[in-house]
A protein has these predicted regions:
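Transmembrane alpha-helical core residues of multi-pass small-molecule transporters
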Residues: 63-66, 110, 178-182, 204-212, ...
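Helix-terminus/linker motif at the lipid-water interface of multi-pass membrane proteins
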Residues: 38-57, 126-133, 189-196, 255-288
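Signature of the first transmembrane helix
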Residues: 20-81, 85, 248-268
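A short glycine-centered flexible hinge/capping loop motif at secondary-structure junctions
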Residues: 51-52, 85-93, 167, 197-198, ...
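Short alpha-helical transmembrane segments in multi-pass integral membrane proteins
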Residues: 1-26, 84-149, 193-248
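Small-residue-rich hydrophobic transmembrane alpha-helices
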Residues: 56-116, 153-172, 279-291
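Alpha-helical transmembrane segments of multi-pass membrane transporters/permeases
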Residues: 107, 162-185, 203-206
Length: 291
């Protein structure tokens, strides 16, 4: 039964049809990415129904920044996926556990430092974005709440990276489905019923990510999928080095693609509120095409 428990999460991609394995593994991964993009779109769609152009612009500018941060975390977490996959491929359980433990320590540090830095820089970020005056307060509020939620975004993405490294790309997809449904329900509650505007959009996003992390942690505990000892959390230079060596170039590459979108947003923001809102919505649609 232990073997069964292990196999519930760990899937050997080196046996059977390569093409079939690749398709079965990559489809849920693509779908997860697609749903993550849908996240910011839901906020925009729902605030557009209940609020004015200023609030829509605030959410569109704020979610653009959050999307950039998210794709960079996803890119960095790719270092974890590769490290774990290589250890499992080499049938080295100890190394896989070490990679998981070091990932948790490394990304906890990244999340806390990132959150503190971004909260300190929230006003300069909103200024650099040339946010239209009417949308400044809404954007600051949206980003402040979302920045507080960065540990949840990071936790979701490293848990997903660990699952994928073990050959399971379906579970992360289910976690993001939970987050998307919760986000839509909470958006209608906070923006529709409670009329909280951009703050409601940010609260919906942050709380739904926390729910998603909670669900994924429960799944890990129930399945006993990852067995870690104290020494796995001890930072190993070569383990963390490898995660960063693989993850940083991917994070930078994905971040630079988003910089191009942000430059367009800045130009649109300088043209006033209506242009800013319109471009923000169109850019969300273009993000899909970049998947």
């Amino acid at each position: 039964s232990d073997k069964k428990e292990e196999n519930a999460m760990e899937k050997n991609l080196t046996t059977g049809s390569v093409f079939k394995n690749v398709i079965l593994f990559s489809l849920p991964y693509l779908l997860s990415y697609f749903l993550q993009t849908l996240y910011g779109m839901a906020d925009l769609f729902i605030i557009g129904q209940y609020d004015g152009v200023a609030s829509t612009t605030a959410v569109s500018v704020g979610s653009q920044i959050m999307h950039m941060i998210t794709v960079m975390i996803v890119g960095l977490a790719m270092g974890t996926t590769v490290s774990i996959a290589q250890a499992i491929g080499a049938d080295n359980k100890k190394q896989a556990s070490k990679a998981v433990g070091n990932t948790i320590v490394l990304f906890m540090g990244v999340a806390i430092v990132g959150m503190a830095l971004l909260l300190m820089l929230v006003h300069p970020i909103v200024s650099v974005m040339s946010t239209p005056a009417e949308a400044v307060n809404g954007t600051v509020t949206y980003l402040t709440i979302c920045f507080i939620g960065i540990p949840f975004i990071t936790a979701y993405n490293i848990i997903s990276a660990i699952f994928r490294g073990m050959g399971d790309s379906k579970s992360p997809m289910y976690f993001i489905v939970v987050a998307c449904i919760a986000n839509i329900v909470l958006d209608y509650l906070f923006m529709g019923a409670l009329k909280l505007g951009p703050a409601g959009a940010a609260l919906g996003t942050t709380i739904s990510q926390a729910i998603s992390v909670l669900v994924s942690v429960i799944v890990i505990i129930k399945r006993k999928s990852v067995v870690l000892s104290k020494k796995d959390f001890k930072p190993y230079r070569e383990v963390m080095g490898k995660i960063l060596y693989i993850g940083i170039p991917i994070a930078v590459q994905d971040g630079l693609i988003q910089v191009a979108f942000i430059v367009i947003t800045i130009i649109a923001n300088q043209r006033g509120l209506n242009d800013a809102a319109a471009v923000g919505i169109v850019e969300k649609i273009i993000s899909f095409l970049f998947l």
